[in-house]
Design a protein with these regions (language model features):
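Active-site-proximal beta-alpha core segment in soluble small-molecule metabolic enzymes
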Residues: 7-178
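An N-cap/entry alpha-helix motif that binds or orients negatively charged groups
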Residues: 1-4
Length: 178
């Protein structure tokens, strides 16, 4: 990989096949799970806790409880998930938050997608508040996730996404200390 700390996480919901997951694990990928069943499957094929990310929305208590039992990284989709996670399980030392910058996502003059219409992720104001609340609850390590366009094949997508996320990361550090 271009960065020794980089890990690709495969979206298990795209192809929830244990044989494929086993191959991906052997090749060094992680598993991005969005449900209880996907967490169970990823654990069963041998992914370690650090190799599993749990990203879901409208999350049932049982899903958060299993994610905590497996000690995987939880990626919160909504600011209200903070209190719900604390109520049904506990807040881990490491938490990731999904960011939605809103508006249109464009590369050059082409609009790639409209994240502002998406129901997923936290707004700019919400992610700042989420980091403050999570810090107050003892979180020590933070991640940030964004998904701004589907089926993107241009080479410009990831550098532009990284630019957006790094800009927000700097602001989060300045405003929250996280």
């Amino acid at each position: 990989a271009w960065n020794k700390g980089f890990k690709e996480y495969f979206a298990v919901k795209a192809t929830p096949n244990p044989y494929l997951l086993q191959i991906l694990r052997e090749e060094g990928c992680g598993a991005d799970c969005s449900s209880y069943t996907e967490l169970l499957m990823s654990d069963a094929v041998g992914f370690k806790e650090s190799e599993i990310m749990f990203s879901s929305n409208a999350t049932p208590a049982e899903d958060f409880q299993l994610a905590r039992k497996l000690n995987v990284t939880i990626n919160l989709d909504d600011i209200t998930h903070i209190d719900f996670l604390e109520k049904v399980a506990d807040i881990p030392d490491t938490v990731s938050c999904r960011y939605n910058p809103g508006g249109h996502f464009a590369i050059a003059n082409n609009i790639m997608d409209n994240p502002g219409d998406a129901k997923y992720g936290m707004t700019h104001e919400q992610i700042i508040e989420a980091y403050k609340r999570l810090l107050a609850k003892g979180v020590k390590h933070f991640g940030m996730h964004a998904f701004l366009a589907s089926n993107t094949v241009t080479n410009d997508y990831y550098p532009e996404l990284a630019r957006i996320l790094f800009k927000v990361a700097v602001e989060l550090k300045e405003k929250t200390g996280a």
